Amino acid sequence: MRCPFCGYEDTFVIDTREIEDQRVIRRRRECPNCKNRFTTYERIEEKPIMVIKKDGRREPFDRNKLLAGLQRAVVKRNIDNEKLEAIIDEIIANIRKQGISEITSKEIGKMVLEKLKDLDAVAYVRFASVYQEFSSLEEFAKLLSQMKKE
């Protein structure tokens, strides 16, 4: 690999580690010419997941968009971002395990609700109210009564 500092053609690897659940390889390299060190990452290039929106549009899955929705649902709850990231990782893994490249936003919403149900009831209700587009107090009451039965 070419050195980013001096352009020398032949650098060598001094350390290799697997990170992110063995899905990424991190390599520390050194240039024999200028002695500078740098890091490279090797990742599997995965087929992008396309999300089919309610209106039929298709757009690439956006992890940050889902994270923002989860963060809104857990505002002022004692839930850290690591748990939210783990939920997203599980959802992505589930989609990939199914071997599909397209999924509806509705299906993603259902997956999120299943994860939030186990994590935090308030976050679950908040997310459900947006996901299911509640427009009245009766819809909230219905959801809460269903939750009490379960």
UniProtKB/Swiss-Prot annotation:
NCBIfam families from the UniProt entry: transcriptional regulator NrdR
Spans traversing the lipid bilayer: none
Residue span(s) of domain ATP-cone: 49-139
In residue numbers, the zinc fingers (unnamed) are: 3-34
GO BP annotations listed = negative regulation of DNA-templated transcription
The protein's name: Transcriptional repressor NrdR
* Species: Dictyoglomus thermophilum (strain ATCC 35947 / DSM 3960 / H-6-12)
Query: How is the cofactor bound, in the record's words?
Result: Binds 1 zinc ion.
What does the UniProt function comment say about this protein? Answer: Negatively regulates transcription of bacterial ribonucleotide reductase nrd genes and operons by binding to NrdR-boxes.
Cofactor dependence is on: Zn(2+)
Family, similarity comment: Belongs to the NrdR family.
- Gene name for this UniProt entry: nrdR
> Keywords in UniProt for this one?
ATP-binding, DNA-binding, Metal-binding, Nucleotide-binding, Repressor, Transcription, Transcription regulation, Zinc, Zinc-finger
User: Metal-binding as a keyword?
Assistant: yes
**Any idea which GO molecular function terms this record carries?**
ATP binding; DNA binding; zinc ion binding
Q: Does the keyword Chloroplast apply?
A: no
Q: Which HAMAP family match?
A: NrdR
Q: Show the coiled coil region(s).
A: none
